[in-house]
């Protein structure tokens, strides 16, 4: 047995995927394996999810791969496993992910039992911070469970496995999701009813189940008979131990409200006194985006010429909301829903090509007196005039995302500066290159 393991290690050692050297297998799933990988340039370690295309051929993979991969780049949060790069060969999709070494929260509870309320609340706070961030990006997980909550070396949680088991159904005219997905014990009643549901509300239900397990060590709804299990879920009202604090009991009860309309929201959760005890908000990495240059190639899917990564000098960029779109559990509905929050980030659509858009944007902002720095499909725009407070007038990043060949999204992101000037810039660009009507612009 030992000899066989040594032979397997020798066989695995030296396997290459571009600049990555693949090592031991960390896990296996329905569509492939997860392997340890080391970046031979930086020396950093990663986990590579290797997906066999032949196993998802019946899911219209070739069509769905046209979705926009750059959406994954938006998910930059300390409590969400980071996707660093996606490499595709003729037979495989290779997702280079952040390596999380602490195992599953599920295993910790199975081994050690329930957490104390203080420790459990800390885990729950991190979970809600991560999910709240996803929802703010218009992304809904839809398969939240303890097995999809990992722990890093410091014991902090990392939400993972946004799903690769099936393709999502499209939103219908009612604006609701109609795909029944998720693990039975964690699924919300409205999902089981298959009448359409709000992705955010269903995620809150699943988080409520997770909180219950963290604090009690058992599932709120469980039965070997699926029909009975579904009846329990739809009824709600799980037994809540009296030894939990009133705040914890109230939180569980409000999260496991079978009515999605009256179920507590993320805002309500964060406003509760129980949640706010010793709460230290997690800070997303979004604000670093304007300061740190990111090689766009690191967030594109490159079509390798072979499994070893010896491709042509001009790799094919695969447009893919797809790595999210492939998932029955990860939905992007909110990405294009209007939000009256602030003007820090504005998106609008255009029928022009990405190349033409960048040229037109550069011309327009130059005429307005802005300086421009260009890199890949991104422009960094600055107005150097200082206001009365001595601050630089405005700094904005403009980026183009391809949804399909005849449709692009222009995203403007303000780092700092005058909101009035930012609005003038947006209105000029919308006039010159945009197709969105005022009702279709997305403001976040």
From Swiss-Prot:
The modification Phosphothreonine is found at residue 179. Residues 313-337 form the NAF domain. The active site is at 143 (proton acceptor). Gene3D superfamilies: Kinase associated domain 1, KA1, Transferase(Phosphotransferase) domain 1. Residues 343-372 are annotated as: PPI. Pfam families: NAF, Pkinase. This is CBL-interacting serine/threonine-protein kinase 1.
